[in-house]
UniProtKB/Swiss-Prot annotation:
The gene is gcvH. This is Glycine cleavage system H protein. Belongs to the GcvH family. The glycine cleavage system is composed of four proteins: P, T, L and H. HAMAP family: GcvH. Disulfide bonds: none annotated. CDD domains: GCS_H. Its cofactor is (R)-lipoate. The glycine cleavage system catalyzes the degradation of glycine. The H protein shuttles the methylamine group of glycine from the P protein to the T protein. GO terms for cellular component: cytosol; glycine cleavage complex. It holds the Pfam family GCV_H. Residues 23-105 form the Lipoyl-binding domain.
């Protein structure tokens, strides 16, 4: 069973967001990484790029599939996880810690209300 931390918010496209001081750390869920299998490559957005919620921001590739990454929130990309360039498997091993993808300076914290809670995300997974 996939881990779904209660303190995070989730997009229906399987990204998660954790907000601290107006900055959202974004990654893909344990469920998503498990479905993808062992990741071999992660393409991330550019620092300084401005994104809207739902914008495609990168790609994760495994030995069996490639999947687009979408930003669950709007704002400016302020940091990317450069460790993933050499160690994409961090997304598999620690998706909610060292496997985060990028950080976004939020332009509208109210968007978080449109994301799923852990219980809502679990219900979505169960219905897939």
């Amino acid at each position: 069973m996939s881990e779904i931390p209660a303190e995070l918010r989730y997009a229906s496209s399987h990204e998660w967001a954790k907000v601290e001081d107006g900055v959202a750390t974004v990654g893909i869920s344990d469920h998503a990484q498990d479905a993808m299998g062992d990741l071999v490559y992660v393409e991330l957005p550019e620092v300084g790029q401005v994104v809207a919620a739902g914008d495609e921001t990168g790609v994760v590739e495994s030995v069996k599939a490639a999947s687009d990454i979408y930003s669950p929130v709007s704002g400016e990309i302020v940091e990317i996880n450069e460790a993933l360039e050499d160690e994409p498997e961090l997304v598999n091993n620690v998706p909610y810690e060292g496997g985060w993808l990028f950080k976004v300076q939020l332009t509208d914290e109210g968007e978080l209300d449109s994301l799923l809670t852990a219980d809502q995300y679990q219900a979505q997974i169960d219905s897939e």
